[in-house]
Amino acid sequence: MEKDSQATSSDTSIEKEGVISQSLSKDGIPNQSLSDDHIGIENISVQPSKLYEAVSALRNYGFNYLQCQGGYDEGPGKNLVSFYHFITVDDFQKIEKIKEVRLKVFLKRDSDLSIPSLYEIFKGSDWQERETFDMYGINFIDHPNPKRLLMPEDWRGWPLRKDYIQPDFYELQDAY
């Protein structure tokens, strides 16, 4: 994906590069620092084509646990976002020493909504990616089981998108 076609967040300001963002840049992985969250966790935006490379680098930096993967919709006509929250886990690590970082991939709603699956790096991403696909329609390339998780297989649409129109269920109510 070319830089000018990359979706950017409409509600997240660009910030001075954080430590992890600087490390990714030194390793030749393009990224954009976003403002830290309310508890100081570094947020970084990466292009969909660089996600797998960025996550592999994070794993090498010691971020060995995918705590959470999810999605959200910035609003009708705006971006869909896939986010990944990574932490360091060590048997002898004190809780206050845990490092955390969050990667975000911004996808234009009207463009290709495909990004690499992280299943080969983090097996725990399996159901999390399936839920994000099921609710937002973000496709995870090379996912081992790319099926809906919560909705029936024949369901149309993506229920957590803000522009989703709920189907009329009167015919189902009359059946009972």
Curated annotation (Swiss-Prot):
Topological type in the membrane: Peripheral membrane protein
Matches recorded under InterPro entries: NADH_DH_suC, NADH_quin_OxRdtase_su_C/D-like, NADH_UbQ_OxRdtase_30kDa_su, NADH_UbQ_OxRdtase_CS
Enzyme Commission code(s) on record: 7.1.1.-
Signal peptide: none
Pfam families: Complex1_30kDa
GO BP terms: photosynthesis, light reaction
Protein's name according to its UniProt entry: NAD(P)H-quinone oxidoreductase subunit J
Native species: Prochlorococcus marinus (strain AS9601)
Gene: ndhJ
